Amino acid sequence: MTAATIVFAANVIVAGWIGVTSLWFPEQARRTVVEDTVAYSETIRLVGAFWLTIALLSVAGLFWPRSLQPVLLFQLLYKGTWLPFVALPAYRAGLPFPTGMALFFLVWVVVLPFVIDWRPAGW
């Protein structure tokens, strides 16, 4: 089992759970995923659709990890953007933000550059 396969499997479990919870049980997602740091809005369901899409693409990544590497790159970019532009300013200002999500994102941003196969296609 490759590192990419492990990451795709983790995506299926974690992003799948967040996606399903956010789409069908948004109030629970508000309490658990974003740790009561935001008021309920339909944005929770929008984010749920996004995360469920990551999970579904990751299912394909279990079978074709090289072809689905762009999913991992996308995760690296959006998580790496969210941390300095959302989590860090909130932390510095003493404002609430989902710390569990921030820690998970931080781990992923550190791990993903070592998991992504940076070789050009065909190598």
Language model features: what each stretch is:
Residues 1-14:
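Cytosolic juxtamembrane helix and N-cap/initiation of the first transmembrane helix
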Residues 84-101:
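Membrane-helix boundary connector in multi-pass membrane proteins
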Residues 2, 34-42, 63-66, 70:
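Juxtamembrane loop-transmembrane helix junctions in multi-pass integral membrane proteins
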Residues 40-63, 76-84:
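Core segments of alpha-helical transmembrane spans in multipass integral membrane proteins
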Residues 24-31, 87-92, 116-122:
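Juxtamembrane "helix-exit" motif on the non-cytosolic side of transmembrane helices
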Residues 13-27, 112-116:
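Alpha-helical transmembrane segments of multi-pass membrane proteins
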Residues 21-47:
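Interfacial loop at the N-terminal end of multi-pass membrane proteins
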Residues 105-123:
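Membrane-water interface at the C-terminal end of transmembrane alpha helices
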